[in-house]
Amino acid sequence: MKPVKPPRINGRVPVLSAQEAVNYIPDEATLCVLGAGGGILEATTLITALADKYKQTQTPRNLSIISPTGLGDRADRGISPLAQEGLVKWALCGHWGQSPRISDLAEQNKIIAYNYPQGVLTQTLRAAAAHQPGIISDIGIGTFVDPRQQGGKLNEVTKEDLIKLVEFDNKEYLYYKAIAPDIAFIRATTCDSEGYATFEDEVMYLDALVIAQAVHNNGGIVMMQVQKMVKKATLHPKSVRIPGYLVDIVVVDPDQSQLYGGAPVNRFISGDFTLDDSTKLSLPLNQRKLVARRALFEMRKGAVGNVGVGIADGIGLVAREEGCADDFILTVETGPIGGITSQGIAFGANVNTRAILDMTSQFDFYHGGGLDVCYLSFAEVDQHGNVGVHKFNGKIMGTGGFIDISATSKKIIFCGTLTAGSLKTEIADGKLNIVQEGRVKKFIRELPEITFSGKIALERGLDVRYITERAVFTLKEDGLHLIEIAPGVDLQKDILDKMDFTPVISPELKLMDERLFIDAAMGFVLPEAAH
């Protein structure tokens, strides 16, 4: 049953309280939620109102949730408040770990749970807006979203196949079914009385327009939270990102903040002010910085790269310290291009950004092989060079943009530590000392589920590295090759004994560059790109 929209009077968009708005959500509706981690573009007031209504009335029931980007704080925010039995029956997310209470329901087999790659998911919403049945892509071949593996299903109660293997001109592709949502929760900064909306205080745009079009064109209700309203036709047309005819309900929250817990607006993050970054940084020399330093060695002048969340996100700061940050461009999948990369849950809230694209377009660029290099953090690696991040230690994290980015980037740099669980190291006198070994081995014999396929990467001619604090590996046809080790570590005791398989030891095995282990600027000069 399609939801019933409130009427417009004299062209004015209905302005309701959040509590009134969520009364328009019927049982069995499919709700698509905009937002990224740390409160970016999150319609918190609407989410809270829906969660509270269900607690009090046990309605609406059996919703399906679509969330392209991981929103939340890795605890109780984001869509975690919606994780109530009976409220949600089904979920399709690009990333799960930012809202872990939803992940808990999936892990306990209490909801049907799917994971599409984040970029693919936003593209299927664009397809839904155009009334196309889905998208066809080679992104995800050989990974857990491939129907020959798990088909993107995250638990035992998830049975229906949403992803199919198809073939055109003797080449394999995946067909991803587009799910048309009935309700949208989106957010902007300002709208006029007819619903035309601007994003001047926001960090980025994500796929707000795509979601609104998908819901509108399928007869649903677009609910938009804003911080303020203005007179109709007074917003600059080039600033308007959402046309008013897409919006059915507006909820005004004058206390809406740009991110969780901060001032209402940080003008550096919104792009209005430029931060003076001329002062040289000096980051503490630890294992995180060590990995980022070694990763920087894989960058080339003029390259366009992507940086992911986790230990990999230090590369931009190390490049600033070395004075070469302006010699290449780092992008984030949610839309930012250039600037200083943020860290933590509000990943993508960059400053000094050069441009901001909508997320769907950013992924089009990635899928087509536009990236020269990407820097991604890994959870586990197996003997075939496969990487796992979407599910480990029994926890569902989801892929985010990991599959989209790593499938086609010309050079792929995976960053992490060799072991996990209370690993402690110190760097002194140009050497690495393992003070306390991690309890958990991260290099295992076989991954139970694959987020990155080493086999497919080799078939596509991609260059793959795995950089840790004590060892560097590269991927070849016969598996992982150990090519560098840190000064101060023992090859057998500190590396081989801490892996569940034995890599090929390169005959040219060498020590990692000694400059990495000295607590001073390395004097690193970016190499020219090969032509």
From Swiss-Prot:
EC primary class: transferase
EC number: 2.8.3.8
GO molecular function, one term: acetate CoA-transferase activity
Record Gene3D superfamilies: Glutaconate Coenzyme A-transferase
Keywords: Transferase
Residues at the catalytic site: 333 (5-glutamyl coenzyme a thioester intermediate)
Reaction catalysed by this enzyme: an acyl-CoA + acetate = a carboxylate + acetyl-CoA
An individual GO BP term: ketone body catabolic process
SMART domains, sorted: CoA_trans
Family listed: Belongs to the 3-oxoacid CoA-transferase family.
Further information: Formation of the covalent enzyme-CoA thioester intermediate proceeds via an unstable anhydride species formed between the carboxylate group of the catalytic glutamate of the enzyme and the carbonyl carbon of the thioester linkage of the substrate.
Complex and partners: Homotetramer; dimer of dimers.
Role this protein plays: CoA transferase having broad substrate specificity for short-chain acyl-CoA thioesters with the activity decreasing when the length of the carboxylic acid chain exceeds four carbons. Exhibits high activity with acetoacetyl-CoA, propionyl-CoA, crotonoyl-CoA or butyryl-CoA as donors, with acetate as an acceptor. When acetyl-CoA is used as the donor, propionate, acetoacetate, butyrate, isobutyrate, and 4-hydroxybutyrate can be utilized as acceptors but not isovalerate. May play a role in short-chain fatty acid metabolism in E.coli.
Protein name (database record): Acetate CoA-transferase YdiF
Gene: ydiF
